[in-house]
A protein has these predicted regions:
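Short, compact, well-ordered microdomains
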Residues: 117-118
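Short, surface-exposed beta-strand/loop micro-motifs that present aromatic residues
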Residues: 104-109
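A surface-exposed partner-binding patch
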Residues: 1-102, 143-146
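Compact, glycine/acidic-enriched structural inserts
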Residues: 125-146
C-alpha cells in the first residue's frame, strides 16, 4: 500500500458512501481504504511515477474526497464536476483520483474498475491497468524509473 503525506482531514465510511450515492458510482475498495487512511495527499518519500511496459508518467498527488486541507485544492467531487459536468472534457464514467504534474487526471472507470490516464490536451483516455490494486503496485520512486 502507498503512504500519503500532507493529507486533508479524515473522512468517514459514511461520508464516502454518501459521495458514491451522489455520483452514482462504487469506488474500488483499495481506493476507499486510501481515502479512509489519508484523505488525498502527496506520495511519501519524494516524487513517484507510474511505470509499466508501455507507459510512464509522474504522479503529483492524490485528490482528497472531501474536506480539503487548504483552499485551492480540488476534491474528487470538485474535479469531477469541473471536467465532466461543466467543461465536458472527461467522460462521465471516469472518476478522477490523482493528478500528474500537468494537472491531468488518473481515473478509475466506473464500468470496469480499470485505471486510465486522461490526457485532456489530446483528448486521449489511456488504459493503464485492469484495477486500482495493479496500478498501485506499479508506482515507483522517480529515480528507479527507466
Amino acid at each position: 500500500m502507498i503512504k500519503l503525506i500532507d493529507s486533508s482531514p479524515a473522512v468517514s465510511a459514511d461520508e464516502l458512501g454518501k459521495i458514491e450515492v451522489s455520483l452514482g458510482v462504487t469506488f474500488p475498495n483499495a481506493l476507499k481504504s486510501i481515502w479512509l487512511i489519508s484523505n488525498g495527499g502527496i506520495l511519501d518519500e519524494g516524487r513517484r511515477v507510474y511505470q509499466s511496459e508501455h507507459y510512464e508518467n509522474d504522479i503529483k498527488y492524490f485528490l482528497p474526497i472531501l474536506h480539503t486541507k487548504k483552499s485551492g485544492i480540488l476534491t474528487v467531487d470538485d474535479y469531477y464536476k469541473d471536467l465532466v459536468v461543466n467543461k465536458k472534457i472527461l467522460a462521465e464514467n471516469f472518476i478522477p483520483f490523482a493528478i500528474d504534474g500537468g494537472g491531468f487526471p488518473y481515473c478509475v472507470g466506473v464500468n470496469d474498475g480499470a485505471v486510465y490516464f486522461c490526457d485532456l490536451e489530446n483528448q486521449e483516455e489511456i488504459y493503464l491497468e485492469p484495477n486500482f490494486e495493479s496500478f498501485i503496485g506499479k508506482i515507483i520512486p522517480e529515480d528507479e524509473a527507466l
